[in-house]
Amino acid sequence: MRRILFFWIVTVVIANPVFVGAQNFSDRFAKGNTSFGGELGFGHTFNLPPGKDRTDLSFAFIFPNWQKNLTGIIAPDSLMQGALYWHVEAGLALLTHRDHEYLIGFSPLMVNYKFLNSQRKWAPNILVGAGFSMQDCEEVAHYELGSEFQFLLHGGVGVELFRESGTYSFNYWLFHVSNAGIEKPNIGLNSHVFTLGFRF
């Protein structure tokens, strides 16, 4: 299965032409440009901080998003050359191997920095931000989640692959869910999330 997935990824990366020939580098990453996209992936909870064993939960991660370039190309001709994006997303985390309990989230306070280079057709990126959600997982994770309303914290890294039209990305996120002490208990859940993203 891993070999098939690896082969598919390599095919996607190689089969399409580099974006630079179709569109000027600075135009593509101009300040004010916007795009829609999405993240599809899988997550699993883990013990952070270490201590009492947390509830084991696995979930599908389905989050459409919107981005706006806030800066255009900054720090030119340096290792930090890139662009800062406002990132807004809303979507669904659906538990697997349970009764399909869910979390519906909205995160309007996120930023994504892409390390850009006109000689590459890919860019590493960093994403951080916050949002809020409603969920019905408190019965299966009562020790960690004491209320339906929860806050969300996101932090992650990825690699974005540029195509003539649109992009693909491969990402890792740390996904934190807690209610900030509104109700007890408030241990919270932390998850590793791996996603495949796309933009158009």
Show which residues each predicted segment covers.
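Cleavable N-terminal export/targeting peptides
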Residues: 1-30
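Short glycine/proline- and aromatic-enriched beta-strand/turn motifs that initiate or cap beta-hairpins
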Residues: 19-69, 192, 197-199
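Short loop/turn motifs that connect adjacent beta-strands in outer-membrane beta-barrel proteins
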Residues: 21-34, 70-84, 116-124, 163-167
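Residues that define the transmembrane beta-barrel architecture of outer-membrane proteins
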Residues: 32-34, 56-62, 100-107, 122, ...
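Transmembrane beta-strands of outer-membrane beta-barrel proteins
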Residues: 34-40, 82-90, 122-130, 168-170, ...
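Transmembrane beta-strands of outer-membrane beta-barrel pores
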Residues: 40-46, 68, 90-96, 130-136, ...
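Extracellular loop and loop/strand-boundary signature of outer-membrane beta-barrel proteins
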Residues: 49-52, 95-97, 139-145, 179-184
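Transmembrane beta-barrel domains of outer membrane proteins
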Residues: 65-69, 76, 112-116, 150, ...
